Amino acid sequence: TLMQDIINGRCGWCGTDELYVKYHDEEWGKPVTDDKTLFEFLVLESAQAGLSWITILKKREGYRKAFCNFDAAQVAQMTDEDVERLMHFDGIVKNRLKIKSTITNAKLFLAIQKEFGSFYNYTLSFFPNRNPIINHFQSLSEIPVSSPESEAMSKDMKKRGFKFFGATICYAHLQASGF
């Protein structure tokens, strides 16, 4: 079907929404090595849990504003008062657990940076020979919802205390950031 095939070099899942097409063509699957962008994707992918990606893409600038331009160190310093303020901010999905988890995840993200030198290095540690995997899927039906790498990474992240980052979300995160 139209939504499942790769059409004109573009994955069918992005449909025709201009924002989605721009995201697909300019960002999705491009290798990301800088931790600030990896943190941004982590925040957005976590927020997406149970929702459609386009919902989060449409609120991306709201998330940028709400979460200190995706500065993990600043987000990690946010307080319960900030959570209350964000519960009244229309620019994001107003889910208390997700807002609080973003702050918790920021603290854990910083701990991983300290332990591994960068979140990028941490991510690479789950891949054979520390190299991203290049897939050549032809249709949506071929794409799995997780991978051995996303299973291992999400299990480790869960053990560390990360929230809203299971194997499926982790796989989407890895795909989006070029792993």
At which residue positions do the language-model features occur?
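HhH-family (HhH-GPD) DNA N-glycosylase catalytic core used in base-excision repair
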Residues: T1-F179
